Amino acid sequence: VNYGNGVSCSKTKCSVNWGIITHQAFRVTSGVASG
């Protein structure tokens, strides 16, 4: 199952896509900085 926020789970394990999370965090941070 892919939750759409960089976390992807199967029946046996969950994996995190840090690239996606870092990108989202950067977008949020830059949005706050500019807004």
UniProtKB/Swiss-Prot annotation:
- What's this protein's name? Bacteriocin SRCAM 1580
Instruction: State a single Pfam family of this protein.
Output: Bacteriocin_II
Ordered alphabetically, the record's keywords are:
Antibiotic, Antimicrobial, Bacteriocin, Secreted
Notes on temperature effects = Thermostable, activity is retained after incubation at 100 degrees Celsius for 15 minutes.
Q: Where in the cell is it found?
A: Secreted
Kindly list the biological process annotations in GO that this record carries. Answer: defense response to bacterium; killing of cells of another organism
Q: Does the keyword Secreted apply?
A: yes
Gene3D superfamilies on file: 1.20.5.130
pH-linked activity: Stable from pH 3.0-9.0, inactivated at pH 10.0.
Q: Tell whether Nucleus is among the UniProt keywords.
A: no
Known function = Bacteriocin with antibacterial activity against C.jejuni.
Q: Which PROSITE patterns match?
A: BACTERIOCIN_IIA
Q: Which organism is it from?
A: Niallia circulans
What are the GO cellular component annotations?
extracellular region
Additional note from the record: Antimicrobial activity is lost upon treatment with beta-chymotrypsin, proteinase K and papain, but not when treated with lysozyme or lipase.
UniProt-listed InterPro entries: Bacteriocin_IIa, Bacteriocin_IIa_CS, Bacteriocin_IIa_dom_sf
Q: Which family does it belong to?
A: Belongs to the bacteriocin class IIA/YGNGV family.
